[in-house]
């Protein structure tokens, strides 16, 4: 078992070197050349749930989206359901549509949502409600009823955490054997889309007195509470429109410092490609160990 873990660990360490120059190193053949590793998400079918950052109609052809880069680099088939302006209470609807249209053929689902919940001042809320109940238990003696506190997830669209509970419960039930990956919301700065749509930068609280950090942190917590991997896009993309020099990654320094432009989307895609190396896209037999030779095929 230790040998197997060492082999897999060594292969993952080698991946950044093997992926240098995506077009030549990512193998799309039935069997990769010796010394090359197939990306675990190569050729997979992935559903994308989200808001304007994912929506193909947001700025149309003016912005090439992150999932489009992944299609190009990893031959991923994208099923895109993100819609501009949507919040976590729209996750069940998008998930239902994905299930209806692509059912069991989808391999994995990526969710990037939450920035509009912050902008709309949805209260963060709490994850659980607690109450005392009786439960049968035994610790070295005859089992008996004991009174203990029990927590149950709060399912409500009135709070951010309640919406996440509903959304992830829905996704887990619709796709119990599929990989589901959460991405934390990106940093945000000024967006001014008209007299009735002005969004201050993230140095300001929203109307319910919360900074965007609370909405990012909730996604991280949700990963542990629901057993879902989280990629901290807020951090690992390295993009922050609050830094003037980094506005090269955002659509317009004058009125839209919120949406990543094509350069920003490409950086998101690069980040996601490498982060996904550590996660299986599906839960079929990904690794086969030949005991006599102790060689791994991925």
List each model region and its residues.
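Glycine/Thr-rich phosphate-binding loops of Rossmann-like dinucleotide-binding domains
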Residues: 56-57, 87, 119-120, 190-191, ...
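Alpha-helical cap/lid subdomain in secreted, periplasmic
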Residues: 73, 94-284
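Bacterial N-terminal signal peptides that target proteins for export
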Residues: 1-7
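Serine-esterase "nucleophile elbow" of acetyl-processing enzymes
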Residues: 21-84, 95-104, 244-245
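Hydrophobic h-region of N-terminal signal peptides that target proteins for export
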Residues: 12-20
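Single conserved hydrophobic/aromatic residue that forms the stacking wall/gate
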Residues: 287-298
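Short, glycine/acidic-enriched loop or turn micro-motifs at the edges of active sites
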Residues: 54, 235, 294
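Glutamine-centric residue-chemistry signal
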Residues: 5, 22, 94-95, 265, ...
